[in-house]
Regions:
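N-terminal beta-strand motif that seeds the catalytic metal site of vicinal oxygen chelate
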Residues: 1-23, 50-51, 63-67, 112-113
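Vicinal oxygen chelate
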Residues: 1-5, 9-17, 57-82, 84-114
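Conserved catalytic-core motifs of GNAT/GCN5-like acyltransferases
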Residues: 11, 33-39, 89-91
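Conserved active-site tyrosine of GNAT-family acetyltransferases
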Residues: 22-26, 79, 106
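Residues at alpha-helix termini
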Residues: 28-30, 82
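Conserved short beta-strand elements that form part of the metal-binding/catalytic scaffold
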Residues: 30-63, 108-114
C-alpha cells in the first residue's frame, strides 16, 4: 500500500463475475500490471504514487475503496452514527486489521487500521 496517510485512499478492489475480462481491460486500457494470485484473485499494480488494488471474482460488479484510518473502532462507530452499516467488524486478516462498512447509499468501504 503506498499510502498510510490517515483518511487517505490506500487500496481498491474491482469486483466482477469474469475476472479474466477485468484483467484484460485494466491491463490494456490503463497499462496496469495484473498479477493473478489464484482462482478469483489478482493483485493490481498502478503507477508509482497511486494506490494499488486487486481484481476479485464476485457475483456483483463494483469497486471497493480502502481508506486508512487512525482509530478503526471510532471510525466504524462514526460510520454507523451517520447512516452507514457495518458489513464486517474489525478483523485481522493476517496483513492488516480492517472493517467494512457501507455509506448511506450502500457503497462498500474497507476501513484499514493505520
Amino acid at each position: 500500500m503506498p499510502s498510510h496517510t490517515p483518511n487517505g485512499i490506500a487500496h481498491f478492489d474491482v469486483l466482477g463475475p469474469e475476472p479474466d475480462a477485468l484483467h484484460e481491460f485494466y491491463s490494456a486500457v490503463f497499462n496496469w500490471k495484473v498479477d493473478p494470485q489464484g482462482p478469483g484473485y489478482a493483485l493490481v499494480q498502478t503507477p508509482a504514487g497511486s494506490p494499488d488494488g486487486a481484481v476479485v471474482e464476485a457475483e456483483q460488479a463494483g469497486i471497493v475503496v480502502g481508506i486508512v484510518v487512525q482509530d478503526l473502532d471510532a471510525t466504524v462507530a462514526a460510520a454507523e452514527a451517520h447512516g452507514g452499516q457495518v458489513v464486517m467488524p474489525p478483523t485481522d486478516n493476517g496483513w492488516v486489521v480492517k472493517a467494512q462498512v457501507t455509506d448511506p447509499a450502500g457503497n462498500l468501504l474497507s476501513l484499514i487500521g493505520g
